[in-house]
């Protein structure tokens, strides 16, 4: 069964965590593409930015960054900065150690705020 605005409303508005997670996950798992899932997740009258974010995260994990439509990214302000931060975040679990390693030094050079 595909999510529709009416069916989504039966789960709630997404204003609390369990509703937002249910809506985002349902939209992600029932979609044939990242675009379809995110659009479904935001086309309801509830907390659509949160449900869209959740669906987008799951769909990005499943399909990778190349699944994001180019027209969503092409004119995105600070695209290069966002992409660099995303890459750095992806390195943290495996490559970052606070032991002075090369990855650690590179992170501290880019984000020296501490």
Kindly label every feature range from the protein language model.
Residues 1-11:
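Small-residue-rich helix-loop
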Residues 11-18:
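Structural motif
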Residues 19, 23-108:
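Catalytic phosphate/nucleotide-handling subdomain of diverse soluble enzymes
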Residues 109-114:
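Juxtamembrane cytosolic face of transmembrane helices
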């Amino acid at each position: 069964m595909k999510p529709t605005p009416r069916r989504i409303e039966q789960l709630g508005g997404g204003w609390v965590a369990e509703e937002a997670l249910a809506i985002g996950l349902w939209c992600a798992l029932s979609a044939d593409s990242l675009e379809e899932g995110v659009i479904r997740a935001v086309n309801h009258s509830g907390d659509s930015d949160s449900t869209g974010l959740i669906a987008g995260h799951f769909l990005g994990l499943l399909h990778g960054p190349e699944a994001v439509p180019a027209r969503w990214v092409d004119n995105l302000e600070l695209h290069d900065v966002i992409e660099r931060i995303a890459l750095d975040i992806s390195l943290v679990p495996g490559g970052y150690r606070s032991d002075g390693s090369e990855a650690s030094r590179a992170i501290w050079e880019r984000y020296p705020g501490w």
